[in-house]
């Protein structure tokens, strides 16, 4: 039984027929059914498998497009990390096209030809839930390489689950005079409702703008009318499946992008490029930093667990204005006494931490806990990793609330919620 075979799988829950697809888990059989949906079946639940028809060997070779460079257009490098923005499924064989070249991108989204000269390659091929700091370092290094080779802008195709973490990491690690745009798709490009093409077009439009910094581009509403440009340290995935899942947190989107008219309307000021194409990276990250959610009845021993594992930093995702139950105070003190930097965010996501309002917050401050202003928890996590990777703990405590790359807005916007 090979990828591309048409199979019939019998389980206690019914019979499933379709094309056998590559699976990322050896314990799961994945098939594409006639209705276009993929189904994963645990092997332990399979009663019988029958091969209905043998599939064809996947054929990936296509003639080159031989596109000439347009000197009037900017050059944008699109780097894939394994997202689905330009992925294609061969329905005859069930195979997923593994390459990610400029030709592949233009075949998938020919509108790109009128926007920029496109370079494209895959730097890794992972599901975004498997992202980790060593991959952030790899992406940063590849961005530097592309800019040094002349790219006017960078687009990172990324899975949506952890895109905000990667956007935060790149915001701190990469200092570049070109725009770096992360883009993803909530619906894969083999589905009629896919948002991949419009998101990618909008991302390339943003990447050719005379701005610098790290941003995320995704659908602005559930239809197909516009996309938003979000600051990389002020964005979060707020819905598991909607196409407009990404929202700016404690801020408003940077810009509204119309992929049809190519119009970009800026909603707030951004840092302009000076056309120098300078790029520097600092990939020093302290990976022993934990993010712990506070909840009623929690066992404070989890804090001691990380301390005893020699973790250097802990981000608490507290309640309300930045609170935690008094019965874990002794464990927090254990951490700070050991020199662990402990900071506080809020699980409300929107709003800011203010530990001076109630006695609980004031007591936490006496224990050495530092409030993180209006940073989302994942941004605070990545920032603490970056700071601990580059500074001594006492300096980290001073810098955690210093705005480094736009992660903090000291004045709360009424229109940001």
From Swiss-Prot:
Which BP terms in the Gene Ontology apply to this protein?
amino acid metabolic process; regulation of translational fidelity; translation
Q: Which Gene3D superfamilies match?
A: 2.30.30.520, 3.40.50.40, L-asparaginase, N-terminal domain
User: Listed GO molecular functions?
Assistant: asparaginase activity; ATP binding; glutaminyl-tRNA synthase (glutamine-hydrolyzing) activity
Report which superkingdom the organism of origin falls in. Answer: Archaea
Database matches in CDD domains? GatD
Q: Which UniProt keywords apply?
A: ATP-binding, Ligase, Nucleotide-binding, Protein biosynthesis
What InterPro entries does the record tag this protein with?
A: AsnA_fam (IPR006033), Asp/glu_Ase-like_sf (IPR036152), Asparaginase/glutaminase-like (IPR006034), Asparaginase/glutaminase_AS1 (IPR020827), Asparaginase/glutaminase_AS2 (IPR027475), Asparaginase_C (IPR040919), GatD (IPR011878), GatD_N (IPR040918)
The answer on whether this UniProt entry bears the keyword Heme reads no
Under catalytic activity, the entry for this protein gives:
L-glutamyl-tRNA(Gln) + L-glutamine + ATP + H2O = L-glutaminyl-tRNA(Gln) + L-glutamate + ADP + phosphate + H(+)
Describe, as the record does, how this protein assembles with itself and its partners: Heterodimer of GatD and GatE.
UniProt name for this protein: Glutamyl-tRNA(Gln) amidotransferase subunit D
């Amino acid at each position: 039984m090979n990828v591309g075979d048409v199979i019939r799988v019998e389980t206690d829950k019914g019979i499933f027929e379709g094309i056998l697809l590559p699976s990322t888990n050896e314990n799961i059989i994945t098939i594409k059914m006639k209705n276009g949906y993929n189904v994963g079946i645990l092997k332990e639940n399979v009663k019988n498998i029958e091969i209905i028809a043998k599939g064809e060997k996947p054929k990936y070779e296509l003639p080159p497009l031989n596109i000439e460079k347009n000197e009037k257009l900017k050059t944008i490098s699109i780097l894939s990390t394994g997202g689905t923005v330009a992925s294609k499924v061969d329905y005859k064989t069930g195979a997923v096209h593994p390459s990610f070249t400029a030709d592949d991108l233009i075949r998938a989204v020919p509108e790109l030809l009128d926007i920029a000269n496109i370079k494209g390659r895959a730097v890794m091929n992972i599901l975004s839930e498997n992202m980790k700091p060593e991959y952030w370092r790899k992406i940063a290094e590849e961005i530097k390489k592309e800019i040094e080779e002349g790219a006017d802008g960078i687009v990172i195709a990324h899975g949506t689950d952890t895109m905000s973490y990667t956007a935060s990491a790149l915001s701190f690690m990469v200092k570049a005079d070109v725009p770096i745009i992360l883009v993803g798709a909530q619906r894969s490009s083999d589905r009629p409702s896919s948002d991949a093409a419009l998101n990618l077009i909008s991302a390339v439009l943003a990447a050719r703008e005379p701005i610098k910094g790290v941003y995320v581009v995704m659908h602005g509403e559930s239809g197909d009318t516009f996309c938003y440009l979000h600051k990389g340290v002020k964005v979060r995935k707020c819905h598991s499946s909607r196409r407009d899942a990404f929202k700016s947190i404690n801020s408003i989107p940077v810009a509204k992008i119309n992929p049809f008219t190519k119009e970009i309307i800026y909603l707030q000021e951004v840092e302009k490029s000076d056309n120098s194409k300078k790029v520097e990276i600092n990939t020093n990250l302290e990976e022993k930093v934990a993010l712990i959610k506070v909840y009623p009845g929690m066992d404070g021993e989890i804090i001691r667990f990380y301390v005893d594992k020699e973790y250097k930093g802990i981000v608490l995702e507290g309640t309300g204005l930045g609170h935690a139950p008094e019965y874990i105070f002794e464990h927090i003190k254990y951490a700070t006494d050991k020199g662990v930097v402990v900071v506080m965010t809020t699980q409300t996501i929107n709003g800011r931490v203010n530990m001076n309002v109630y006695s609980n917050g004031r007591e936490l401050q006496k224990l050495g806990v530092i409030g993180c202003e209006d940073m989302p928890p994942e941004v605070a996590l990545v920032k603490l990793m970056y700071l601990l990777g580059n500074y001594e703990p006492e300096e980290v405590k001073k810098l955690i609330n210093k705005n480094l790359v736009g992660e903090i807005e000291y004045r709360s916007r009424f229109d940001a919620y």
